[in-house]
Amino acid sequence: IGGSGGRLLDILQVLYRKNPHMRIVINAISMETIAELKEVLDTFPMEEEEILQMQVSRVKKLLSYHLPQAENPVWICSFTFRETGTDPMDNAKKTKQNAGETGNGKNGEVQR
């Protein structure tokens, strides 16, 4: 999965409902997608998860020198869904609601 346009959780929810044992591979280059990956890891039951960061350099010739120039890093996250019998998005919503009710603010005050 790549180029999710900020809808990664929605895409994965549909895939999980179709096959809760599916193998997933997600490519990420933007900080926004990398942040979404953290939410994915916290939301969906999974096994065999692996996260890689790959860096590639291209060699450019400058006069008599060959200089490596770094390209942007690519993150690759792979995992297999694990079936639990419940919808992971429902569990995530409940967790967010509970966090909103009991979240600690400055000096321990409750935030809503």
What label would you give each PLM region?
Residues 1-3:
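Helical hairpin unit composed of two closely spaced alpha helices linked by a short loop
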Residues 5, 55, 83:
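A broadly conserved detector of short glycine/acidic/proline-rich loop/turn motifs that flank catalytic sites
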Residues 5-6, 31:
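Short, surface-exposed acidic/glycine-rich loop or hinge patches that mediate macromolecular interfaces
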Residues 14-70:
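C-terminal substrate-binding/active-site "lid" region of AdoMet-derived donor-dependent transferases
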Residues 65-96, 109-112:
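Core SAM-dependent methyltransferase catalytic element
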